[in-house]
């Protein structure tokens, strides 16, 4: 018996000595499935970025700090922001709303395609990609190394959005201090769309259109052709809002807070106020690319001036 205890002691001691920290700090795959009526919506995480608080306008630094402290969102790296996309499965076809940044914003983003496959889907089976607008963190994910990531998909953007970024005449309307950023964005957009334009798989839509059951909603301001998409099923509604909001803390508590990269700040703020009021009043679901992953939830009206983001409750199995 004594020999047994000695042997066990040696074994346990060996286990203690050989223990090592995990080699990777990577989290679990970034996808979450949500059953919305007859549709299965899979949130896909592209990654996380940090925005400089100075990018948010109409609030003093003291006011920003107060709100961020209230929501335990103070971070020396900046204001944490998710980049999400949403895959909608109607049982017959797959529609992707926005596509992430691929490599356009560096290595911290670019996981949409990988997470889509980890969720059990195939890139070749995506038939439609709806783009709320053409900023790189929404369009770059459709291509990689000059090739289509979704080889059988048709890409859609609003006609005004396409005109603003792809019509050479639009450059003349851009202020001189913004022209460099504008031209850099145009370069990324053209590179992303090129493999689809080559096979005539890039199309534009207009106000009032319905694409694969998605109703087009005019939410311009962030960009001239920014649009959201509404889907209805079994008495419920969900709105894929795009970039009407970039911070779950600042812009719900103070919705008149703009961001520096809104093309038309006043219009973007008015759009946000209108959409927050409508979404909260009708208790619509929201799917948002820049709210904390999985980016699905509701908007609650606190008072005449403030709102609150209510994320969905995590469920370890799909409810039918």
Mark where each language-model region is:
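Metallo-beta-lactamase
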Residues: 21, 110, 117-121, 125, ...
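Cleaved targeting-peptide boundary
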Residues: 20-27
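Conserved beta-strand hairpin/beta-sheet module of binuclear metal-dependent hydrolase folds
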Residues: 30-119, 228-244
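Cap/insert and terminal regions of metallo-dependent hydrolase folds
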Residues: 234-320
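Active-site metal-binding motif and surrounding structural segment of the metallo-beta-lactamase
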Residues: 91, 107-156
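Active-site environment of divalent metal-dependent phosphoester hydrolases
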Residues: 29, 52, 134-141, 223-227, ...
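Active-site metal-binding loops of divalent metal-dependent hydrolases
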Residues: 46-47, 99-102, 134, 160-161, ...
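Gram-negative bacterial Sec-dependent N-terminal signal peptides
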Residues: 1-19
């Amino acid at each position: 018996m004594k020999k047994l205890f000695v042997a066990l002691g040696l074994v346990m001691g060996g286990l203690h000595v050989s223990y090592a920290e995990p080699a990777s700090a990577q989290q679990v795959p970034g996808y979450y499935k949500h059953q919305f009526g007859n549709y299965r919506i899979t949130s896909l995480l592209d990654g996380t970025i940090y925005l400089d608080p100075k990018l948010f306008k109409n609030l003093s630094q003291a006011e920003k700090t107060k709100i961020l402290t209230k929501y335990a969102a103070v971070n020396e790296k900046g204001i944490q922001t998710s980049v999400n996309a949403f895959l909608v499965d109607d049982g017959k076809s797959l529609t992707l709303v926005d596509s992430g940044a691929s490599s356009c914003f560096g290595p911290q983003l670019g996981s949409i395609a990988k997470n889509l496959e980890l969720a059990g889907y195939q890139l070749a089976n995506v038939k439609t990609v709806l783009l709320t607008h053409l900023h790189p963190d929404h369009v770059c994910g459709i291509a990689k190394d000059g090739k289509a990531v979704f080889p059988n998909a048709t890409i859609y953007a609003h006609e005004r959005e396409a005109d603003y970024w792809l019509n050479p005449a639009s450059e003349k309307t851009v202020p001189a201090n913004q022209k460099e950023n504008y031209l850099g964005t145009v370069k990324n957009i053209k590179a992303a769309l090129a493999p689809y334009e080559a096979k005539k798989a890039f199309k534009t839509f207009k106000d009032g259109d319905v694409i694969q059951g998605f109703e087009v909603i005019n939410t311009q301001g962030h960009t001239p052709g920014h649009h959201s998409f509404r889907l209805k099923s079994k008495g419920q509604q969900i709105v894929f809002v795009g970039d009407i909001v970039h911070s779950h803390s600042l812009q719900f508590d103070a919705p008149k807070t703009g961001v520096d990269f809104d093309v038309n700040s006043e219009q973007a703020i008015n759009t946000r106020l209108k959409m927050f009021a409508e979404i909260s009043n009708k208790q619509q679901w929201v799917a948002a690319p820049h709210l904390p992953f999985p980016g699905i939830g509701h908007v609650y009206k606190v008072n005449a001036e403030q709102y609150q983001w209510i994320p969905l409750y995590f469920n370890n199995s799909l409810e039918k």
